[in-house]
C-alpha cells in the first residue's frame, strides 16, 4: 500500500493482477482486500479471501495451517534510515539507547531481539505508523522485509535501505490448508510469468531505482 495516498499498490498487487490473468484469462480481474500482518491468516481461514499475496514469509509454523506456493520473492529483513544516518547495518543498533521501529505480528520484532538484543523495539500496528515514528525521531531505524522498506524509500526522498539482508525470508503465496490443486495452478502461473519476462519487469519497476536495494538478490527465488 502507498502510505501517502492510502491506495493499494505495489509489487504484490501487480503480481496478483498478472497471476490472475495467467490463471483465468486476459480479461480476468482480481478483487483486492487490504490486510495487516495480524489479519492475513484469519481472513484466509474464514474464507473472506482466496489467497494471500502480501509479503508473507514462508515459515514452518505457517505451513502447518496454510499451503504455500514456491517462493516468488527473495525477501530478507533490512533497515530503513535517514540518508544522513551513521547506521550501516543491524549490528550498529546493538547498543543501549538505540530504538528500532517495527510492526506487530511480523517476524521483524523477534529478529531484532536476536541480532541487536541491546536495542529497544517499539511496535506499531502498521507500516505507515512505524514510518511516521521514524520521521518524528522516535527511533534510529525502521526494520522489516526489504521489499516493504524499498517501497517506502521510493516514495519518500531522504530515506534509504541499508545493511543488506540479515535474514533469509522468502515470500510465498498462501491459500487455505488442503488446496493443493490451487497451489499447483499458482506455481504453474508463476513459472510462466518468470519465463515470459513479466516477473523481471515488475522487479525492475518497483525496486530498480531504490537506493541500497539488492535487485538481483530479490529476484533470486
Tell me what each language-model feature is:
Residues 1-53, 196:
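Extracytoplasmic small-molecule ligand-binding "clamshell" domains
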Residues 13-22, 91, 106, 173-211:
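Extended ligand-binding regions for polar small-molecule ligands
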Residues 26-28, 45-54, 97-99, 135-145, ...:
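Alpha-to-beta junction loops
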Residues 30-42, 87-88, 122-132, 136, ...:
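Short helix-initiation/N-cap motifs at beta->coil->alpha
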Residues 39, 56-64, 111-114, 131-168:
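A ligand-binding cleft/hinge motif common to bilobed small-molecule-binding domains
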Residues 70-72, 82-99:
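Flexible hinge/capping segments at coil-to-helix
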Residues 73-81, 146, 150-191, 209-221:
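Periplasmic-binding protein-like
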Residues 107-122, 161-165, 191-221:
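Ligand-binding clefts/hinges and TM-proximal coupling segments of bilobed small-molecule sensing domains
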Amino acid at each position: 500500500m502507498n502510505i501517502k495516498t492510502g491506495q493499494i499498490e505495489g509489487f504484490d498487487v501487480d503480481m496478483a493482477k498478472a497471476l490472475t490473468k495467467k490463471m483465468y484469462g486476459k480479461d480476468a480481474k482480481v478483487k483486492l482486500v487490504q490486510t495487516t500482518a495480524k489479519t492475513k491468516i484469519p481472513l484466509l481461514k474464514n474464507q473472506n479471501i482466496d489467497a494471500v499475496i502480501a509479503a508473507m514469509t514462508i515459515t514452518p509454523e505457517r505451513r502447518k495451517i496454510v499451503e504455500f506456493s514456491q517462493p516468488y520473492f527473495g525477501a530478507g529483513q533490512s533497515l530503513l534510515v535517514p540518508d544522513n544516518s551513521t547506521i550501516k547495518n543491524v549490528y550498529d543498533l546493538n547498543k543501549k539507547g538505540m530504538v528500532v521501529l517495527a510492526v506487530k505480528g511480523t517476524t521483524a520484532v523477534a529478529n531484532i531481539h536476536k541480532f541487536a538484543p541491546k536495542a529497544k523495539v517499539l511496535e506499531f500496528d502498521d507500516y505507515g505508523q512505524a514510518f511516521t515514528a521514524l520521521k518524528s525521531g522516535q527511533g534510529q531505524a525502521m526494520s522489516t522485509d526489504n521489499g516493504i522498506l524499498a517501497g517506502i524509500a521510493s516514495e519518500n526522498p531522504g530515506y534509504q535501505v541499508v545493511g543488506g539482508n540479515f535474514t533469509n525470508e522468502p515470500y510465498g503465496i498462501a491459500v487455505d490448508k488442503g488446496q493443493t490443486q490451487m497451489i499447483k495452478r499458482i506455481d504453474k502461473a508463476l513459472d510462466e510469468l518468470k519465463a515470459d519476462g513479466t516477473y523481471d519487469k515488475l522487479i525492475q519497476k518497483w525496486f530498480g531505482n531504490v537506493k541500497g536495494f539488492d535487485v538481483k538478490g530479490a529476484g533470486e527465488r
